[in-house]
Amino acid sequence: MASETITIHTKQDIIDYVNERKTTKRTSLLLIIVLGTIFLDAYDLTILGTATDQLTQEFKLSPTYLSFIMTAMPFGALFGAAIGGFYADKLGRKLILSVSLISLIIGAIGAALSPAPAILLCFRLLMGFAIGMDSPVAFTFIAEISNKKDKGRNVNYWQVVWYIAVVSSALIVILLYSLGTGAWLWRYSVALGAVFATIILVLRLFYLSESPSWSMKNKTLTEASKELEKNYNINVNIEPNKGEDESFSKTEVKNPLRTLFNKRYCKRTILATSIATLQGMQYYAIGLYIPLIAIYIIGENKIESLSGTALINIAGIIGGLTGALLTTKYGARKLTIAGFSIVGTAMIIIGLFYGHTYTWLIALMVAFFLFGHSGGPGTQGKAIAALSYPTILRGKGTGFVESVSRFGSMFGTFIFPIILANLGLNKTMLLLALVPIVGLIITTYIKWEPVGKDVEHEDQYIEKV
């Protein structure tokens, strides 16, 4: 049953309604369904991180081959993000959000059944492509269904969901391990990702409609109003001003890449891309391999190392929630600066004192790393991208940032186990501490704050066809 009735006269009324409407249970439900992508992203990426020992043993993998398998998803995501962002602006948000999940389900099932490492590698590439296609569109959709005040906070909830997925993956592996799954442990774990993806796909097909902002730009007033009705469960009376419905004409950005780097958007694009890429480097090097780091800190007992992984990652949930709740008050940029500072400090302390101090102190520093990362750059890079561009450019902008950021993910995922095997934990941490230091310098220098800004009325800066 519809909760309220509104009257729409122009397309601008649609945007005004979205920007001014308080967050309701219906909006929260849509957010949870869309953020399901982030759960899948984190789960599918980290689940193999809990089973690197099994993969190495079953397939006789070298550290380099293991790195290739672990890097396959970020590599696939690089291309998926570019394509997903482009076609989300062209064909709509909902279609891409559905196609990507179907691809992810196929990839997860194939990966779980892989008889050889090369086949596993191929299906992980497909999974990465699907996640890459979905993620920027998910951030875009969240920004477009949230009111102006809550946009930054709602987009930043993704990091909370991410760490819930990471903790869940560790607990699921513990459960499956306790059930005696043996050598099939990693296969069952990966297959569960397909089950989760299927559930989210069904929820999206049932509850999700097209983004009202995209509809406003690409459909008639009547059609856009219908999408508004479906998303917010309201009744819309359409009383168009003269010529409003007939004035519809679909427009596209003439040269998206050039537009992203024009005088208006260049600093925004550089800032968002830099933060997203550098946070990917530091997280996928350290956070993704926490089960491996836990072996260094705690020992080789499977249950103990996984329990330690779950416990340490709770710091990520707390940090992500803190960052999301503080975004409106302090802005994305300031929280990013604070986060890079915390991450760099934690990595330097681990690098200097691992092996020379108490084990609990090193574990605390890893948790400190996750808290700073999830509340700062881990959260804010995606938010800055989603909030810095108007609807006509948002999909391409978030797609570009997400695509480039995957280079950072690939670097961290591929290089960490190799450096760790050759240099040990101390030198590896000190070397990788350069990443948050560079991020701190860039974020301090580029002074763009998107939180609370109205970017929808910037058509004069965008060349269209």
Protein language model features and the residues they cover:
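Transmembrane-helix signature of 12-pass secondary carriers
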Residues: 2-465
